[in-house]
Amino acid sequence: SCPYFWPIGNRYIFLFFSHTTGSQYLLGDYNKEEHCFYPTFHGRFNFMSFLPGGVHAPSATSDGEGGVIVIHNMHTGKKSPGWRGITTLPRKLTLDKCDTINIQPYGDYKSLRTHHQHIDKTHLPANKEIIIDNIQGNALEIKAEINIKSSPMIEMNVLRSPDKEEFTSIKFFKDRGVDLVRTNPALKNQRWSLISLETAHSSILPDVISRAPELAPVYLKPNETLKLH
């Protein structure tokens, strides 16, 4: 349901919603004479069930420059009557030269910024949590650049209470996914990396429903730093 079909780069993208797994897309080629769409790649915006806390029902439009702007409906982590819910921030989809869909925040989100905090270059020792005391709040925009080097995994806990009763975990696993050549012949001898979002400890409220971890593939080029935004 909620189908949208738009050109993206030199190809086409078909966005839709599954009532079991949430928002998804097909990337492919469109024959205007035959009026046929030939998909070559399937991707997801949601990697588990859309309930609770998943994204669904996309609304999309062209940005007029070869990209696509999409906004999703989203269920909260609480039971709510009827069709009540929230919407995500807009996302801009673009197609890179390797036929990979790039996703980035879009719109005037800069107007939401208030108290800027900057953290200088910091060494991250293995198997130790580094707590940044001066970063607080329940609504944060994070722009972080991390040199993964040989680390197989890095974890960032956000929205963390002082005693760690509540926290949301973001984990990045370098080169721990499947071979990239399976989905793109141009990317030989490389593997997908993986990023997970875990909200099992995000709230201690009794009426908040926990969600299974999201686990999504991410392409990180050799020697490229990880940029989280």
Regions found by a protein language model. Name each.
Residues 1-6, 10-18, 67-76:
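Hydrophobic core segments of beta-strands in well-ordered, beta-rich domains
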Residues 26-28:
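Beta-propeller blade termini and top-face loops
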Residues 21, 31-45, 49-53, 59-229:
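Beta-rich accessory regions
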